[in-house]
């Protein structure tokens, strides 16, 4: 006797391995000779980088190398937007900031050491001098006349305007009985998956092969985008998504760390690991929502809807990654 596929309670098969601690997450991946990366991040939302002094950090125990955006800018490329709509204003997005930071948590320096603790200790010794610039917090303020401009290539702090138009809304208004309007404020949120993001990279200099373990929802797209950003041949990149401890959509992107780690592994000819702390994740992992939507529903007293006028402002942050509305 067989069990019907529909309308029956099917026993899950994946749970025992995970709830008994036999899963394999990025943090569980350990390779011989592996180094650890800690990133120095901007405490300011908008600032010019005046100087970076890593002399004391380089003397710290266990430190193997320290990289700035200036050091790696030719190799790191620019992070792309995963999906662009017509007339999107794409701006350069360096994985390690060069000259200017544009959000709290923007990565500025990568410290590489024999252990995470040693890299963290050394990172605390890196001295970055900033010149703080004006900021905007609310979307209405960002669009106001005279607002500080985050990117020269995106005037009025607007990445794109996407219009979908079918029929005449003015005709619907004039020929209908009633119109109801409402503003909806969809608050910003932080996904906070159980497993923080993490990356392990092994580079084989003999074959030029990059193998990456990363906590992601899109391993195939990560490979495509990584090849695009770094110029490394796609057929020489292998991306492995091991067990992923949640995401809520926050692991649908190519992140800066997924570009920084393979470039450092290639430079040092040793495996590297980066795993974010929980507090770091609040700064460096994408947030969600943060929309303001004004809706007008036009219709007749018999319940027929004759028109719908929807205008949405979406806070995309400092850079586009994957447009979602």
Where in this protein do the model-derived segments appear?
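Beta-strand segments within the central parallel beta-sheet cores of soluble alpha/beta enzyme folds
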Residues: 235-242, 270-279, 306-311
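Solvent-exposed alpha-helices and their adjacent loops that cap or buttress functional pockets
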Residues: 11-12, 29-33, 93-95, 100-105, ...
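Alpha-helical support elements that line or immediately flank enzyme active sites
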Residues: 39-70, 109-129, 199-268, 314
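Helix-loop-helix junctions that connect adjacent transmembrane helices in secondary transporters/permeases
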Residues: 148-230
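Flexible, low-hydrophobicity surface segments
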Residues: 1-155, 179-182, 267
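Glycine-rich and small/hydrophobic secondary-structure elements
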Residues: 88-118, 249-301
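Gly/Pro-rich active-site capping loops and adjacent beta-alpha segments
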Residues: 2-3, 74, 91, 118-138, ...
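Conserved small/polar residues in nucleotide/adenosyl-binding loops
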Residues: 32, 323-325
């Amino acid at each position: 006797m067989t069990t019907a596929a529909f309308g029956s309670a099917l026993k899950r098969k994946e749970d025992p391995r995970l709830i008994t601690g036999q899963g394999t997450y990025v943090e569980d991946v350990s390779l011989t000779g592996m180094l650890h990366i800690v990133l120095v991040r901007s405490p300011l939302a908008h600032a010019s980088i005046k100087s970076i002094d890593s002399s004391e950090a380089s003397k710290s125990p266990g430190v193997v190398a320290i990289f700035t955006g200036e050091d790696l800018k030719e190799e790191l490329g620019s992070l792309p937007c995963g999906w662009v709509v017509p007339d999107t204003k794409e701006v350069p997005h360096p994985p390690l900031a060069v000259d200017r930071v544009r959000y709290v948590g923007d990565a500025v320096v990568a410290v590489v050491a024999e252990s995470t603790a040693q890299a963290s200790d050394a990172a605390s010794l890196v001295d970055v001098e900033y010149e703080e610039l004006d900021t905007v917090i609310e979307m209405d303020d960002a669009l106001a006349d005279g607002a500080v401009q985050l990117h020269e290539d995106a005037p009025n702090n607007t990445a794109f305007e996407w219009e979908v138009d079918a029929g005449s809304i003015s005709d619907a208004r004039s020929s209908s009985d009633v119109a109801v309007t409402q503003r909806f404020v969809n608050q910003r949120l932080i996904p906070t998956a159980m497993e923080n993001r993490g990356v392990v990279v092994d580079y084989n200099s003999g074959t030029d092969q990059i193998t990456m373990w990363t906590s992601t929802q899109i391993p195939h797209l990560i490979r495509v985008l990584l090849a695009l950003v770094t110029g490394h041949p796609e057929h020489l990149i292998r991306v492995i998504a091991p067990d992923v401890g949640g995401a809520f959509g926050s692991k649908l992107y190519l992140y800066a760390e997924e570009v920084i780690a393979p470039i450092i592994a290639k430079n040092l000819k040793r495996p590297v690991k980066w795993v974010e702390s929980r507090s770091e994740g609040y700064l460096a992992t994408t947030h969600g929502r943060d929309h303001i939507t004004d809706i007008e529903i036009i219709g007749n007293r018999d319940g027929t809807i004759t028109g719908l006028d929807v205008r949405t402002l979406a806070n995309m942050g400092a850079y586009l990654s994957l447009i979602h509305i």
